[in-house]
């Protein structure tokens, strides 16, 4: 899967009004089984999720994503999350995790609503940072 820096930066600007990813980080993502999903409405991007497989594990890190403010609360984030989980399962992965901060309460609520469990919390630059994880092999002994 191709993860083009210009495309990711365009999506970031649309959602966050600024660019957070670096060329170095995107190169890392590109080299670790990236999963990039983009949601469109009327042929225009309105949301995205970008993740990658953590080397040496069967875990997908859902690293970056969001939905444009004009399109929130319409099910787009839920659809992206479900599709990312399905792709991770298809890839044979057994876990998916994400991090979030207090300022992204909707992301935290979406994760909790979908069975993600809080596995760690600590202060990062004066703000609480949370790690959430979901076992994709529910009901399977492993």
Where are these regions (language model features)?
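C-terminal "cap" of GNAT-fold acetyltransferases
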Residues: 114, 121-142
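Active-site rim helix/loop that mediates acceptor-substrate recognition in acyltransferases
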Residues: 15-41, 50
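Conserved active-site alpha-helix within GNAT-family acetyltransferase domains
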Residues: 78, 90, 102-120, 128
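Short amphipathic alpha-helix that is part of the acyltransferase structural core
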Residues: 1-22, 142
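Conserved GNAT acetyl-CoA-binding A-motif
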Residues: 88-100
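A conserved beta-turn-beta hairpin within the catalytic core of GNAT-like acetyltransferases
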Residues: 53-63, 72, 124-128
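Conserved beta-strand in the GNAT
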Residues: 38, 44-53, 59-66
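Conserved acetyl-CoA-binding loop-helix of GNAT-fold acetyltransferases
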Residues: 67, 73-86, 113
């Amino acid at each position: 899967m191709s993860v083009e820096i210009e495309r990711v930066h365009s999506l970031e600007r649309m959602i966050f009004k600024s660019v957070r990813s670096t060329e170095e980080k995107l190169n890392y993502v590109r080299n670790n089984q990236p999963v990039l999903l983009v949601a469109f409405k009327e042929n225009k991007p309105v949301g995205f999720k970008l993740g990658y497989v953590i080397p040496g594990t069967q875990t997908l890190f859902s690293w970056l994503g969001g939905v444009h403010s004009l399109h929130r609360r319409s099910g787009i984030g839920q659809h992206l999350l479900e599709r990312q989980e399905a792709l991770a399962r298809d890839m044979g992965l057994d876990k998916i995790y994400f991090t979030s901060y207090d300022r992204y309460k909707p992301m935290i609520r979406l994760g909790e609503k979908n069975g993600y469990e809080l596995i760690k919390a600590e202060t990062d630059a004066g703000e609480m940072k949370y790690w959430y994880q979901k076992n994709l092999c529910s009901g399977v002994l492993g």
